[in-house]
Amino acid sequence: MISIAALLLTRALPACAGGREIADPSGGNPLFGMAQQMANFVYLVADAATKQAAVVDACWDCAGVAKIAEGLGLTITGALYTHKHFDHGGGAVPERMATGPGGSKIMLEGAQTMAALGAEVFVCAADGPDLASATGLAAVTPLEEGTVL
């Protein structure tokens, strides 16, 4: 399972509890076993006053992340990615790790799905072009050290 931790920047939301599991095997994701082995973490950071949230490294189960946010009454307006690797930002899974039916590439949803859900996508400037290319996005918002969001 992949854990999603919730950290609220102002006063805590009563319904919020850290450590929720996403990437549920009942969802039929062919990559569930890999997701479980990689033990990636996703963080949902929210402002309790505005109910706006940003998600960090949402990749394996974006629908699960969105469902948790919705259940907390939050609107995800930003998706921040720590780096360009497929298991953080999405894109094609390396062939040596997994291929789909008929040898087709398996894609992780990641940044592309979060953008489709209305979130602005952020990543460090050096990884921006690669993440955009890997996920099919026209562009992502670059972050430099010291950027204030």
Language-model segments: which ranges?
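Active-site HxH/HxHxD metal-binding segment of metal-dependent hydrolases
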Residues: 38-39, 61-149
